[in-house]
Amino acid sequence: MVCLLKIMPIFKKQSLEHYLRSRFGPAATLLSYGPIGKESSKGTYKQYGYGSPIKVTFRIGTLRRHAVLETMSPGPFGHEHMADRAQAILWDYESYGRLPRHVKALDVGAFTSTQTLFSVAKAREFFVLTEWTEGASYHEDLQRLVEGGSLRTLDRRRTRALATYLAGIHRRRRRDPPLYRRRLRELIGHGECIMGLTDSYPVPFGFITQDVLAAIEDACNQWRWRLRNKTHRLSQVHGDFHPWNVLFRRGTDFSVLDRSRGEWGEPADDVTSMVINYLLLSLCRWRRLHGPFELLFRLFWDTYLEQSGDEEVMAVAAPFFAFRGLVIASPVWYPKLPMEVRRRIFRFVENVLGASRFDPARVNEYCGL
C-alpha cells in the first residue's frame, strides 16, 4: 500500500484505522503498525534510501492481513518537491501489478496536513482549477508591430514593466546547491527542454541534421559544467515567461499564467524566454533584429540589468538561449516558419554557445549578419 507524503508523519492510530475502514470496509480493525527496513540503511555498502516503509497489520472480520505503507522523503535525487514524490508514487501504483512476481499495490493515497489519509486510486488524470483573469495576451502587442504598427509609448512602458517584474521576483534567493544543479540537469535532459526538443526534430530537416543537434547538446552540457558551481544564483522564477503567458489589462497592469518546471531556478531562464521573442518576430519581419523589436530587446535588457544589478546573467545566458532557440526554430512548435529564419536562429544559438559571455549589442552578429 503506497501513499503520498511530504514529510514522514507521526501516525495516529485513529487516523490509520479510519483509512483502513474507508478502504477495506467497516469490519477492518488495526492491530499494529511500525517501521521496517531499517537494516537497509545500516548495511556495509548501502546507506541511503528514499523512504520509510511502515508495516501495517489489520484484521477484516476473522482474516488477518499485512500491508506495507510506503512514503518518500524529500531528497536531492529529483525528489525535492512534493510533485516529484507524488509522480514517483503514482507511477508505483500504476506499474507494480504489471510486472510478473512484483508485489501488488493495494491503493495509492495522500495525507492531509492533519495526517488524515485518503485514497486517490480512482484518479486517471489530474487537473488544476485556477481563477479567471481578464486581459489580452502580450503577443497581440508584438504581433501588431510585426504587421507594421507603430511603436507606442505604452509598448516601452510594458517592456520596462515586464523586466522590472522579473528583477523583482529574482531578488528572492534560496541557498540550495543541489537544487540549482538539478535545474541545470533538467535544462539539458528534461523532456520539455533541450534533449526533449532535439529528439522532437524530424531529421534531416533542411540544414538541421543529427550532427547539428548533437553539437548543440554537447555545447550545452559543457555550459552545465561551467555553471554548476554558481549555486548562489538560485532564485524564484516563473519558468516559462513568454508573451503568451502574460495578460495585460489597462496600461502596465498585467497577470502571468502557467509557471513551469519549478519555483526556483536560474534567472537567465526567464530573461531569455521573453527577449528571444523580440528576436524571433523581428527575424520574421526584417530577417534581423531591427526597428521596434531591437529597441524593445535592448530596453528589456537595460531595464533588467538596472533593476537587478545582475551583470552575471549575461555570463550564464547561453544554454538558456539555446533552449529557447530550439523551441522557436522547431518545426513542431512553429511549422510555418521560413527556413531562412530557422537558419538564423540556429546560427544565433551556435554563436552564443561559442561566446564566453552574451552581449546584447551583438545579436545580429550572432545571427550571422
Regions inferred by a protein language model and the residue ranges of each:
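Regulatory N- and C-terminal appendages and interdomain linkers associated
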Residues: 1-67, 76-88, 98-105, 147, ...
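Surface-exposed helix-capping loop/turn segments at secondary-structure junctions
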Residues: 100-105, 171-181, 201-204, 227-231, ...
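All-alpha amphipathic helical-bundle segments outside canonical DNA-binding/catalytic cores
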Residues: 157, 309-321
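A glycine-centered beta->alpha junction motif in the catalytic cores
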Residues: 74-75, 127, 131-151, 196-205, ...
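Active-site catalytic-loop/activation-segment of kinase and kinase-like phosphoryl-transfer enzymes
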Residues: 126, 131-133, 172, 179-226, ...
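Active-site activation/catalytic loop segments of kinase-like enzymes and analogous catalytic loops
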Residues: 261-264, 268-308, 322-340
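Active-site acidic catalytic loop and adjacent metal/ATP-binding pocket
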Residues: 43-68, 169, 221-269
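Conserved ATP-binding subdomain of kinase catalytic cores across diverse folds
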Residues: 41-44, 49-52, 57-190
